[in-house]
Structure formats: C-alpha cells, structure tokens
Amino acid sequence: IQIEYLENGDYTETVINDELPDNVVISPFATTKTITKSKTTYYKNSAGTVLWSVTIKGTFTYNGSTSKCTSCSHSTTAPSSAWSIKSASHSKSGNTATARATATQTTSTGTKDFSMSVTIKCSANGTVS
C-alpha cells in the first residue's frame, strides 16, 4: 500500500488487488507463464471516504529472464456525488501498464479538476508491483 498526502488534507492510496487469479499456465511444460493483476489508486478525503478512483488491469507474460505486458484496460469510479470522471485512458510499454484519469469536483464555489495515474509492472520472475 502506498499513501500520499495532499495539501488540501485529502490523500491518495494505491493498492494491488489480489482478487484476480495469479498464474495461468497453459501447459506444465510451458516456459512462459501468464499473470493478470490490477492496481487501484483511490482518492480519499481526510475521513477516509473514497471520492473517486482509477484502476489499471494488466496481463503479463514472463519466463524468468524477460517480461512483457500483453494487454491492459482501465476502469474508474466516482462514488461521491460531488465528483465526476472527466477523462480516462490507458497505455502499455514493455512490462508496464498505466492508467490516467481526471476527475472534476463540484462545490458551491465552482469546479476543480484533479488528475491521477497508476502504473503496474511485472518483473521477469512474475513479481507484480
């Protein structure tokens, strides 16, 4: 878990989600393994309430000497009525995948945009970070 505190009293929390199946090996003799994981960055207020989030999901292959991201996707949530997702995208390069999102906060004084990104990476031995 990674936590970053912001100047306005809010903070972001990034976690790797473990609910996805780990290794999918096509054959017991296969030298290349496949792993799918997701990683989420939550934007929370000082009380710990999730205001919005962005998730990157990546599928990787690895063989002990190299690793590669073969596909990725992103998702967003904005459970707070004061927040809405303005834009979101994802990209992959080598053994990493990144999701980027911008959310808009609406208050009585107007609107303000906040941006976050989350990157997931797989090592040659299948360690996801």
Regions found by a protein language model. Give the residues of each.
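A short, surface-exposed interaction/processing loop segment used at functional sites
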Residues: 22-26, 70-81, 126-129
